[in-house]
Structure formats: C-alpha cells, structure tokens
Amino acid sequence: EQMQERLLLSMIEEAPAGSDFIVLPETVWPYAYDERYLPQAPVVTKIREILREKSSGAMIVTGAETIVYYPPEEQTETARQNERGAFYDKFNSTLGIDTTACLPIHHKGRLVIGVESTPTWIFKALKFLVIDLGGTVGQLGVGEPGPAFVHNGVSVGTPICYEGLYGNFYGGFVREGARALLISSNDGWWGDT
C-alpha cells in the first residue's frame, strides 16, 4: 500500500508542466477514505504540496474508494453495518484535487453487475467465483451524474469506467454543466487500448 501511494505521487510529479488536468486511473488509491476526513488526509495534503511546487494550475482527477457514514434513520438501500453498528456505503468515486480547499467528489452511479453490485450477503457466499480486476467488489453505494468539477473556468464531468456504456447517464454530466468529460478507468477492463 505504501508502494502504491508512492507510485501515485510519482505519477503526479511526472505530469507535464502547464497541465490543466491530470487524470489518474479508477483504483489508483491504496485505501478507502472516510469522506468526512478526506480533505485533511495525508495523501491529499501531499498531492496539494506537489501541485503547488510543480503544477499549480492543475487539477488531479483521480479514482478513489470513499466511505460515507449515515445515521440509522438515513441509511440507504445499499448501506451496510459495521461491527460497531454504524451504517455506511463504500463508493467507487472520482475526486478533483487542486491547490484550493475545495474537493469535489462524484460517486459512480452505474455499477458493474456481479462485481460492484452484489448484495453483501450474496457476495460473501459466492466470493470464490469473483475475478479480481482491481477495485472494490461487493455492493457499492450508488451515485448520480454529479455537478461538474470546475477548475480554472472549465467545467468537466468525471464519469467512471462502466458509466460510459450508458449514454443517457453519461449525458447527465453535460446536463449538469460539463463542457468536457474526463473518464477515470482501469484500462485492463478494455483490453489493449
């Protein structure tokens, strides 16, 4: 996990000077992050430091696994309960990180059936059948096409991988104000591209 974080940071350091956006893969982050603490997470702080030093005008659009906790009366259909009784969802997300305090997040809304969209109780029984292609498996939380990430006056939608197969969903990013789409994916899903 530390090696993966070092690779993540080195990819950002190697980005060409003058880049407006740096797009990283869907599952590049080594941990799942609680969204309440994400803006202060050490890796986000390091990324912002690198951007200030090397690419102050850039926004990193990166995939990440995030966690949202709910009060019992507000839990979602996809929420699960942890050992302490708290309800939460894990999300396949994209983040927009720049040198400001703003940290927009998009939660994937079209999940891969059988990998990202499998109720936890079924997944536990059938886990031995799952092929690991990277990322989280099991039942994830579900998002909607979100408002565009705005950086330096440019509005971008940040769909994640499989969402690109759903034209109307994909178009939702444009309806929400995106002028460009930056898709975060693991290329292994698509073969030799």
Predicted features along the sequence, with ranges:
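Enzyme catalytic cores with a strong preference for nitrogen-chemistry domains
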Residues: 1-193
